Amino acid sequence: VTQVKLGKKIAKILKVPMMVHVGEPPALYDEVLEILGPGDVVTHCFNGKSGSSIMEDEDLFNLAERCASEGVRLDIGHGGASFSFKVAEAAIARGLLPHSISTDLHGHSMNFPVWDLATTMSKLLSVGMPFDKVVNAVTHAPAEVIKLDMQNRLSVGARSDFTIFDLVDSD
């Protein structure tokens, strides 16, 4: 917890948001949430790890819900072992959506279970996150965190980078 508090102090001095990884304790998920404020990001928000899953403890779920409503941004941060279908499905069914969807892609997660951002997006669709919210969570939402202006990004003469997806129902 001391490291998280120190990080928060530095983030305040630099006037930047802080991003914190939650998973195995220490620090506990609730302790991290209590330190974060509006604009800060907690990643691995839907992990299923013992002692750190928002679905293990109703108080922790309520705290995550309250913090999200106050501006703490929940990020998927899938990674190699930090995404639980069960937790994501239950949280989304209760109305708690992630602010952003990220892969946490690294050498141990690239070939399984993350694969790529499109696969991670598909996982969120499969557990009930609405399509428009999924698209926002990989475009405007993360851009907002780093204060990237998204106005007129697709306009005549502007440099654009986009992907076209084919949405297919499947198991």
Regions of interest found by a model, annotated:
Residues 86-165:
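His/Asp/Glu-enriched, well-ordered alpha-helical/loop segment
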Residues 1-111:
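Active-site core of metal-dependent hydrolases
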Residues 169-171:
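Short, Lys/Arg- and Gly-enriched loop/turn segments at beta-strand edges
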